[in-house]
Regions:
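Acidic two-metal-ion nuclease catalytic site recognized across multiple nuclease folds
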Residues: 1-4, 175-226
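Conserved non-catalytic scaffold segment of RNase H-like nuclease domains
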Residues: 1-118, 122-128, 149-165
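Short, glycine/acidic-enriched loop or turn micro-motifs at the edges of active sites
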Residues: 19-21, 136, 173
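Buried hydrophobic packing segments
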Residues: 113, 137, 174-178
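Short alpha-helix plus adjacent loop in nuclease-associated cores
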Residues: 130-146
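A structural signal for well-ordered alpha-helical segments within the folded catalytic domains
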Residues: 146, 172-175
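Acidic donor-binding loop at a coil-to-helix junction in glycosyltransferase catalytic cores
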Residues: 168-169
């Protein structure tokens, strides 16, 4: 499985974030989770799972609507959150080498990740790293709606994974969805550094220099890479 990806990369890092809001240059990451996959004896194998609450900036807090959505409270962050600088170091370790970064709605997560690294780490660790957005893939495979929970249901995974709006659950759900996508049509490598966006809304967040953006309708008639 994922033969085309592992022909190009030594490591896949599938990740997800939970944040205090939607504005990547103002709001903050409060949880970062990732699964690191490498080939071991020719078999894709999870070699590391990472899930960490992230400390807030001085005076920061988790808004009530985010507490309700995620179950993460300001008190949780105060008691269990790691400093941003430490989380940034952990991420740098995960993505070193010939690594592909993957996420569901990667534009959102990468925008937040870049700004956290800019403030508290080294954004250069993302330079030269290829990216794959599984939301773009799913839009090509199924009609609207396109939330992660929609993909979970479409691929019959509801009894195996959950879209709980906790990063650790969502990243495991993303891995399961990705596996089903690969079984369905093994063309994930065609979406590397190719992100779709809804024409009505444009590209959300800061455009990523290494990514090609193409308008993608809600009900795609052909793969975006054609």
């Amino acid at each position: 499985m994922f033969d085309a990806l592992f022909a190009k990369y030594d490591r896949l890092v599938i990740f997800d974030t939970e944040t205090t809001g939607l504005l990547f240059n103002r709001d903050e990451i409060i949880e970062f989770a990732a699964v690191v996959v490498e080939q071991v004896n020719g078999v894709p194998t999870v070699i590391r799972e990472y899930d960490q609450l992230v400390s807030l900036s001085p005076g920061g807090f988790v808004p009530p609507q985010i507490e309700e959505l995620t179950g993460i409270t300001t008190q949780d962050i105060r008691e269990k959150g790691l400093p941003k600088t430490r989380v940034c170091r952990d991420i740098a370790e995960m993505v070193q080498g010939n690594t592909l970064l993957l996420a569901y709605n990667a534009q959102f997560d990468l925008s937040f990740l870049f700004y956290m690294l800019l403030r508290d780490g080294d954004p250069a660790i993302l330079k030269g790293k290829d990216k794959l957005d599984l939301l773009t893939v799913y839009r090509d495979r199924r009609g609207y709606p396109h939330k992660l929970c929609s993909a979970i249901e479409a691929y019959g995974l509801s009894d195996k994974v959950v879209n709980s709006h906790r990063a650790v659950d969502d990243v495991l759900a993303t891995v399961a969805v990705m596996e089903e996508m690969e079984k369905e049509r093994p063309d994930l490598d065609r979406y590397i550094n190719l992100f779709g966006y809804i024409p009505k809304y444009g590209v959300e967040g800061k455009p990523i220099g290494s990514v090609t953006y193409k308008p993608q309708p809600y009900n795609a008639k052909q793969p975006l890479y054609i």
